[in-house]
Amino acid sequence: MAYNWQTEPNRAEPQEGGHDHQQCHHADQHLSSRQVRLGFDQLVEELSNKTPLPEDEKEGTCFVPDTPNLDSKWQSIYGPHPRHFNEFTSQSPHFSQLPFGKASAIGFNPAVLPAHQFIHEGASWRNPTRKYHGGEDPRFSALTPSSTGLDKCHQQGQSGTEHCNYYVEPENNVPHHYSPYSMDSIPDSEEKGSGDADLVEPSLVFSKDSFLPRASENMSVESTEPIGCPLEIVEAPQGSNKSLASFCNNVTKIRGLYHASDTNSNSGKIWAITTAYPSRLFADTQFRVKISTDNSAQLLLLKPPANYLVKDLIAEILLLCANEQLSPKEYLLSICGSEEFLQTDHCLGSHKIFQKSKSVIQLHLQRSRDTPGKLSRKRDDDRSRVHLNQLLEFTHIWKISRQCLSTVMKSYNLHVEHLLKTQEDVEEKPLSSMFSCGRHPPQPHGNDIIEDVRNICSVLGCIETKQVSDAVKELTLILQRPSQNFHQNSETSKKGFIENVTSELSRSLHQLVDVYCSSFCTDFRPARAPGGVSRDHAGLHSHLSFTVCSLHNVPETWAHSYKAFSFSCWLTYAGKKLCQVKSCRSLPVTKSFSFSVNWNEIINFPLEIKSLPRESMLVIKLFGIDSATHSANLLAWTCLPLFPKEKSPLGSRLLSMTLQSEPPIEMMAPGVWDGSQPTPLTLQIDFPAATWEYVKPETEENRTDHQEPPRECLKHIARLSQKQPPLLLSVEKRRYLWFYRFYCNNENSSLPLVLGSAPGWDEGTVSEMHAVLRRWTFSHPLEALGLLTSRFPDQDIREVAVQQLDNFLTDELLDCLPQLVQAVKFEWSLESPLVELLLHRSLQSIRVAHRLFWLLRDAQGEDYFKSWYQELLAALQFCAGEALIEELSKEQKLVKLLGDIGEKVKSAGDAQRKDVLKKEIGSLEEFFKDIKTCHLPLNPALCVKGIDRDACSYFTSNALPLKITFINANPMGKNISVIFKAGDDLRQDMLVLQIIQVMDNVWLQEGLDMQMIIYGCLATGKAQGFIEMVPDAVTLAKIHLHSGLIGPLKENTIKKWFSQHNHLKEDYEKALRNFFYSCAGWCVVTFILGVCDRHNDNIMLTKSGHMFHIDFGKFLGHAQTFGGIKRDRAPFIFTSEMEYFITEGGKNTQHFQDFVELCCRAYNIVRKHSQLLLSLLEMMLHAGLPELRGIEDLKYVHDNLRPQDTDLEATSHFTTKIKQSLECFPVKLNNLIHTLAQMPAFSLARPAPQTPPQECCVLNKTRTIQRVTILGFSKTHSNLYLIEVTRSDNRKNLAKKSFEQFYRLHSQIQKQFPLLTLPEFPHWWHLPFTDSHHERIRDLSHYVEQVLHGSYEVANSDCVLSFFLSEHIQQTLEDSPFVDPGDHSPDKSPQVQLLMTYEDTKLTILVKHLKNIHLPDGSAPSAHVEIYLLPHPSEVRRKKTKCVPKCTDPTYNEIVVYDDVSGLQGHVLMLIVKSKTVFVGAVNIQLCSVPLNEEKWYPLGNSII
């Protein structure tokens, strides 16, 4: 985790080392009624529970704060108990009266961190010897350090703090002489000396001014703190960290653009999602809409066209209701069952609900004024301000630290004052009077002062600079010397020395506090600025150098385990190292107040400052030399940007270090680790007292070096751009593309590809990249999405990308919102255009704000960037307003309750789980009694008011997810069931479903509705989240179970199930059509994404025919293995039982050809958007998903998309995958294993009653069967029998029944009449396989006769009558339920379908399908196609396809290529169809008359001409 010293609280157990009797202050009590809750409620609650406020028995005792919420790593190092100097006392009567009876034990575990910057020996207090020679450079302008330069650079370098949201307003309580953010500069001064070595070991003499002060304008050396000036700090509502205060100010400005009175941006309503109108899909579509109104109970049934505007529909409704005088602008249409409203300025077909729902849509008409937006911002929200101290109060950390620091400072000031006063009294007395008493002069308050210094350092993270240490030692020596050893004049007396030393000690402490406030985010700062000095600035041609001074607060366990410590550092940019790693010497720890390591080593990189990229990062790693093995072990690391806000760091910096095992080089950005949040381990670095401001060079575009490329080069550029993503381009291809960059445009290339091919990030290359950027015209905003990946850290490039995304509609932004949240990681500051875009859109849309809230909540569980996400989340909550924040707070409480219930259900035994769940449901009922209503995190438009207790349950899978059914708060809506799952990472499911949704959107825009069901999924935290339940959906495993033990091996299982649940012909045809399209869609998406772990338990079907997949824990080809063999052996799931249903039991084999055509068409449409899909996946590479981590995962998707193929090649490829899936027997075997595993759960021994094997028609019991005769059997399907049924009225009808259907009838009779003696059914052992089918007919006829002439009750039962009398549904299917992409010829003549292309002497022939082909005896052939090009210069003229066995309508989709064809004129294509060696048909085609690039059916003759 990014914050290793914080752990998740265990509220059931007291903290180790804590005090159970102590009380905690709740975070809420710090909020006034007008303050806005800004997030971190969970963090507040954790700290409130984990951080007791101890009340010491001894009055006047104060506890210096310990480190808050140390996690296991820090606790194992520092231990859970505070050390002895965390507690300090005073016997002073003045000190005992100070108000610190209670203080929180929050802060830092004691240990001392060593001295600050050391420079050459002989350097005076204000005169360091090092010198930097300045120079001119167009990229940088040297800035002399101002009196506040250190503060400015330190603050700008911070990426943020964990606790952010503050008032940004003028501070009236700050003394006027303190100017924390002044930009005034001070004069330069000439200094001598320079360092050329990479590693320079300076003298151990410490420079007294290494802490660069924050004085006001032109403050010189003499402008120092006067003697006797006390240590004081003041509250800083804006925060001591300037970058965070600036971010708060920026957030306030953004929120100020959207006033509560603006109903356009602040309607408070949730609008239905809209997309671009898919005109191809809804060319002549009319929707069926039912309208309800408040004034009438009668529903209006309308059929408006898809392009009908919502406001026009409202006007028509008002006209029909005789309310023509009312204005349509005063009304809105809401979707029944939700709090979602149609957007009045959009057409109906643009709304997602109309695009996906094919049933009647129910809408409700209501006045706008009667539906006030309950989630809108109020005027009080406009008056609230974002205030740093609000967040800091929530944590209790800095507020109490400020109190403690102020307390110990007051103690220090009192003791210093008493010491000087006492010494003055002593020296005023005659020496003789002192010696007459036989004693030395007293040494009052000396030890108290040293103890106060120790406590001040402890509050400040146990940071003890060498200045402080030296001053303490000097004070101790002076106090130990007798007064007679000093001269008696005012300057050389003991009192004079004490005044000088205490003044120096105060100044050192003051500088320590100042640098601490500059480096870390606190809500206090020194009341006065330290004195300033004049400095030279280093030349831009100088090499980058800085001094690594000290490591503070080294754990005692490390001091004993490691004999020495060292560090290494390097520079990174865009995930790559800019130079070789620099290492330092190893040194042991030293002990003063605590343990520290003092290196004071100068690091000099062989890189000129002007050559460094603007977004360079410095990374430092700490190593410990093991005492036993002498090996170097990585202990901690930290990082910081070299040019935060385009200026270099200045002076001394304190950096917190993290115990993460390795720094993520590929993710190195300012937010990866927030050094402004103190940790127990702190590193001190000194930068030169100069700064540089980055100036973007203005360069002219130069194309004189490049001649106009030939046509072949432009074609090659287009091929490269269409075939490869940037990450997978070879070095040669990138070099080629970059060389011709000025000839790339949006027609032949993509901007991420061109810029990603740049050879580096030096000044010249970046300038050329900016030149390409300026002249580029984007074809679509989504093209810019690839510029926000980690490969493009340049701020100008990212800004252009955000400008393009700003052209998106707000609803369109939702499709890529998870990727944008991840892209925040690689921004250079929280004031970036991307962050501003997210906040702007959140203020414009409640749906965006709601989704962004939960994405940020979930992102805080990642290992890195946690602080940035917390600050962005706080800014979002500030912008959202109190009403929305209150709703989000309810949702968080609901999530917590469900998480607790899930844990209790898991911990209970199998027998007690149901009882535990029923008992815990009561807590949800109490929750709704208190809050009345709550929106669901899964969808903010769904508002619920209670729990349907009887409908709640849990699933028996490993994670034991809960099924929770909520009562809809909308009276016109049904109950809402969701799955709450804890224990599985749902972020991967979210990503897969998001990519599938993008594919579906692409299909819809192309006019192709694949009938996809894409359910909702939302991760709400670490390994927990919600999943939408699709009504009336069952797993394929349950369907297999109802078909007996070997149900997965049967081919008619799916067909039979749909027949049972769709009694009407119209319903059956609709289900068949929905299955046809949805099965094709899921075949495509699961193949492209490589979804694994596919079996009948994660494939679901609805009665309306929709098929969809669930559970995406394995994808990108990461299949599970058993004994080294992959369990997923098929490219995707398409089994013979699915084909059996599509082809209606093999009767319509041309439907399989239609299915293949649909799959290939959908596949080729998605392939056109390969770059978009790869960009979306690439942006999630650093999200910490278990199966998406590297380039090889992207390459897997790229290889499945095959963007380098033509559409013909891709069609042939995917057809091969369909055939491989269809022939993969291990899929059926895997389904069988899962079915057997489910047998105990479904009680297969006594299955539940189910419907008859045929559709259940309502029959009249007076109708009886006179006779049933089995006439024969099918030649193609040997288990299908033709029967003739004679009714009592002598009417006859024919039906086809399978052997399995007869068996199902027998089973149904047994269940319905368990007490009757029934005839024995002829099982398979009565029907030997070697016997003829006539014997089977005889046995079945005997069985039917016994059934009909036996018991009257059985013969006239519903199941028997429905079996024989109801017409077989397939007899009524005369019209094809499919929408064929091409035209079908009504005749039955044999034909072949071809598609031909001709380009650059290359003739390509795609052999697609044959139909209506038979052998001379009428049987199905095993046909292949032979093709001859006549005449052909080559000897090899014949080319042939593979053989398709036993099929009258075979599918091939195979490519035949002839090269070196100079022209089509005079060439004839001879095509022959054979079944092995038997001739089937042939055709000769004159190529000059062939329509190229078009599919065409050619008739086959019976001879070769």
From Swiss-Prot:
Residues 1-32 are annotated as: Disordered. Residues 278-370 form the PI3K-RBD domain. It holds the Pfam family PI3K_C2. Residues 540-688 form the C2 PI3K-type domain. It is found in: Membrane. Transmembrane segments: none annotated. InterPro entries: ARM-type_fold, C2_dom, C2_domain_sf, Kinase-like_dom_sf, PI3/4_kinase_cat_dom, PI3/4_kinase_cat_sf, PI3/4_kinase_CS, PI3K-type_C2_dom. Predominantly expressed in normal liver. High levels also found in regenerating liver. Very low levels found in heart and testis. Residues 1109-1135 are annotated as: Activation loop. Residues 1259-1371 form the PX domain. Residues 954-960 are annotated as: G-loop. Its EC number is 2.7.1.137, 2.7.1.154. Residues 703-879 form the PIK helical domain. One of its GO terms (molecular function) is ATP binding. Residues 1384-1505 form the C2 domain. Residues 1090-1098 are annotated as: Catalytic loop. GO terms for biological process: cell migration; chemotaxis; phosphatidylinositol 3-kinase/protein kinase B signal transduction; phosphatidylinositol-3-phosphate biosynthetic process; phosphatidylinositol-mediated signaling. Residues 948-1226 form the PI3K/PI4K catalytic domain. It catalyses: a 1,2-diacyl-sn-glycero-3-phospho-(1D-myo-inositol) + ATP = a 1,2-diacyl-sn-glycero-3-phospho-(1D-myo-inositol-3-phosphate) + ADP + H(+); a 1,2-diacyl-sn-glycero-3-phospho-(1D-myo-inositol 4-phosphate) + ATP = a 1,2-diacyl-sn-glycero-3-phospho-(1D-myo-inositol-3,4-bisphosphate) + ADP + H(+). Belongs to the PI3/PI4-kinase family. Generates phosphatidylinositol 3-phosphate (PtdIns3P) and phosphatidylinositol 3,4-bisphosphate (PtdIns(3,4)P2) that act as second messengers. May play a role in SDF1A-stimulated chemotaxis. This is Phosphatidylinositol 3-kinase C2 domain-containing subunit gamma. It comes from Rattus norvegicus (Rat).
